Amino acid sequence: MADLDLGEKARAALPRCDRLPAVGTTEQVLGGMYVFEGATLGGQFIARHVEATLGLTGGRGYSFFCSYGVATGRMWQAFRATLSAYAPRLDGDSIVASACETFDRFHNWIVDGRGERLTCP
């Protein structure tokens, strides 16, 4: 935000996510991490688009999408290995439900009154 020259007042006016997903169980943590790590992986595509479209470089103005930088693929593979190691011993339906809840909460925060609420089945 600082790279985009947003003033303190503009930053303070941005909506806050006040309904974070639950993370009280290992299943909830893994489900939430699936969404976060998947978004991090997808951020690489967004970063390239922002660079090409807006002419920004070096992550300035879009560093959120660059997170792990060149280590993004390696971090995704590490998460997949962790998920694969734990998932067989846990309740898979709970992991999926937590991923859906995490996605729903962040989606609803972003659209906040500008679109239809999303709810995973």
Give the positions of each predicted feature.
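Metal- and O2-centered redox machinery and metal/ROS homeostasis
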Residues: 1-121
